[in-house]
């Protein structure tokens, strides 16, 4: 019985620290230092939540920039279905899937002459990616300019405005948040 008391007191102490103090402290610090990020990086227009800067949305119309394909096919960009869902490079199903995506992109973007950027035909690891490169966004400009009756220059400037540089200059590449870019595109129509 004498050996049980130290084990029980250690258990209760660690339970208090890891189950109470640590979660409350990290939540409080997150809310204090990073309130926007700690609350989901929600994009708001007035009182309406339009999306999250962290999760892509299924923009399918010709007047919108399209993001990376969602790996959660039945319900695109569903965070509850997220996970390692990409097929292996050696899987013949991946070739068929990419060929179908290429054909769909070519059909939707007949005026685009350059080769299709790889991120427009491959899903990210989570299947929820909200970012593409500025080059992938620029590849879609002819379709969007035609659908929205906007100039190529207007769309190029919009992409440049919403492009984010990597935190460290030589590590990573610039990206464009598709949700923010498409919401800005809708504001041009107002």
From Swiss-Prot:
Taken from the UniProt record, the cysteine pairs bridged by disulfide bonds within this chain are: none
Pfam families in the cross-refs: KdpC (PF02669)
Q: What topology does it adopt in the membrane?
A: Single-pass membrane protein
Q: Name one GO cellular component term.
A: plasma membrane
As for subcellular location, the record says: Cell inner membrane
- What are the recorded GO MF terms, alphabetically? ATP binding; P-type potassium transmembrane transporter activity
| Key words of the record | ATP-binding, Cell inner membrane, Cell membrane, Ion transport, Membrane, Nucleotide-binding, Potassium, Potassium transport, Transmembrane, Transmembrane helix, Transport
Membrane-spanning residues where?
A: 10-30
Q: Which family does it belong to?
A: Belongs to the KdpC family.
Q: Subunit structure of this entry?
A: The system is composed of three essential subunits: KdpA, KdpB and KdpC.
| Chain's role | Part of the high-affinity ATP-driven potassium transport (or Kdp) system, which catalyzes the hydrolysis of ATP coupled with the electrogenic transport of potassium into the cytoplasm. This subunit acts as a catalytic chaperone that increases the ATP-binding affinity of the ATP-hydrolyzing subunit KdpB by the formation of a transient KdpB/KdpC/ATP ternary complex.
Q: What is this protein called?
A: Potassium-transporting ATPase KdpC subunit
Organism annotation: Shigella sonnei (strain Ss046)
Q: What is the lineage of its organism?
A: Bacteria, Pseudomonadati, Pseudomonadota, Gammaproteobacteria, Enterobacterales
Instruction: Quote the gene name from the UniProt entry.
Output: kdpC
